[in-house]
Amino acid sequence: MKEKNSFKGLCTKFEKSIIFFFKFVMYAACFATFFLLFAIDNREIIGLSRTAAVTLSTYLIMLFLLTGIYGKYDVGMRKTKQIVFSLALAAIFTDVVTYFELTIMKTNEANNTTFKLENVGIFFLVILIQLLIILLMTHTGNTFYFWINEAERCLIITSEEEDSKRVAHALDEFQKRYEVNGIVRYDISDLKERIVQADTVVLYEVPVEVRTKIVDFCYQNLKNIYFNPHIADILEQNSKSVVVDDISFFASQFHMITFEQRIIKRLMDIFLSLFALIVTSPILLISALCIKKYDGGTVLFKQKRATVHGKVFEIYKFRTMKEHVGNYSVTKKDDRVTPIGRFLRKYRIDELPQFFNILTGDMSLVGPRPEMLENVEDYTKELPEFRYRLRMKAGLTGYAQIIGKYNTSSKDKLMLDLMYIENYSILRDIQLLFQTILVLFKAEDSTAAFSSEESEDER
C-alpha cells in the first residue's frame, strides 16, 4: 500500500509531463499512420523531396489549426467522448485536405495526366486506425488524470437556492471532476466555515459587493473560484492597463466593428451563402416539393425578427407544422409537426432558406440569433441590457447558439452574445463556422446551434 501511494505521489509530481507524453504519443501515432500507410504507394512523401515537404507542412498546419478550433487534448477538462469527437473531426478534416493535396501534386505528366483518386482504401484505413489511437490515448489520459486528481468539493453560493439547481445539475454532469457538497445563500452565518471545507467555490447571481468580499476570503484560503459574469465583467475583460502620471487604470474602450471588418464580413456572407445555396439547391427543391405534396400548404414559414439596431425583417424557414394551428411552443412529440417537418427539424434542413436572408443582407452567417419581436420586448423588460446584443447583425449561427443549449436562459444567452461582440474578429467568425460543423453532428437536443426555442415557435 505504501509503495502504491509513493508511486501515485511520483505520478502526481510529474502529472503534466506524463499527460504531455500521452498527447505527444497520440499526435505522433496519427501522423505516422498517415505517412507510413500512404508511403506504400507514394515513397516520395517520406524522402527528401518537395512532395514530402509540402505534404508534411500541409498536414501539420491543418492539424494545428483544426485542433485549435475544435478542441485539443484537454484531458481532465472535458469528457472522453467530447475530446474524442473533437480530435476525430480535426484528424479527419486534416486527412481529407492532405489526401487531396497529395493527389493534386501527383497529377502530372510523370504520374496521372488527369485528376484521379487513388488509395481510397488506405485513406479509410488511416482514418480507422487514427480513431482507435485517439480513443485509446484519450481514455488513458482521462483515466490517469482522475486517478491522480479527486473530484473537487464544490460549494455553490447564491442569492436564490432555486436558481442554482441548474448550476448543480451542470456540475453533476462532470461527476469525476466536481462533487457538489452544498448550495447555500450568501448571507448564512457560517459561510466562511463552509468555504473552508470546500475545494472550489461557485458564485452564482451573488451581488457584486458581496462577491468581492467572498473572492477576497477565497483568495486568502487558496480556494478555486468560479463566478457567473455580470455585464460589467464582460465589458472589463478586454481592458488594458493604463498609467496616467502615477495613477493606474483599466481602460475599457467601446468596441465597434471596424469598416474593414464590416466589408470582409459582408463579402464572406455573400460568397458563402451563395455557395451554400448552390450546393444545397437539390435539398431545397426536394424539401419544398415534399412539403407542398404533403398537405398542399405554403412551403415557407415567415416571421418578423429583430436584427442590428432593432431593424425588423422577415426570416425564412421551411414550414414544419400544420397550417392554422395553435400558437404555443412545440413539444418533442407534438402532433402539429408534420412527418416531413419532423425530419427537416431533426437535420436542421428547415433553416436552409435563411441563406436567402444572408444573401440579401438581412442576416449574417455569424452573429446573435434573431429573436421574435415579442421576445425582444419581454427580454428587454426583464434585462434592459438585452438591447446591447442588437449592436451586431443577427446570424444563422454564433457563440450563444454553439455553446448554449435548448434550455439556456435568456440572461446566459445575452452574456454569450456579448462575449462574441466584445471579442469580435474575422478569425473568430471563421472559427465559429467550423465549430458549427461539429455541432451539426451532435445529438439534436444537446445544443441549440440553430436555436431550438425559436424554431419551435412558429407564429
Protein language model regions, located:
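N-terminal hydrophobic signal-anchor/signal peptide
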Residues: 1-30, 139-278, 447, 452-459
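Signature of alpha-helical transmembrane segments in polytopic membrane proteins
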Residues: 1-144
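C-terminal terminal-structure detector
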Residues: 2-7, 387-459
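Loop-to-transmembrane-helix entry motif
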Residues: 87, 91, 267-275, 347
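Residue-level signature of catalytic and energy-coupling elements of molecular machines
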Residues: 225, 282, 310, 355, ...
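Short, glycine-rich, amphipathic interfacial segments at transmembrane boundaries or analogous
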Residues: 232, 300-336, 397-415
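A hydrophobic, helix-centered structural microdomain
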Residues: 260-323, 432-459
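A short, structured surface patch at a secondary-structure boundary
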Residues: 332-393, 432-440
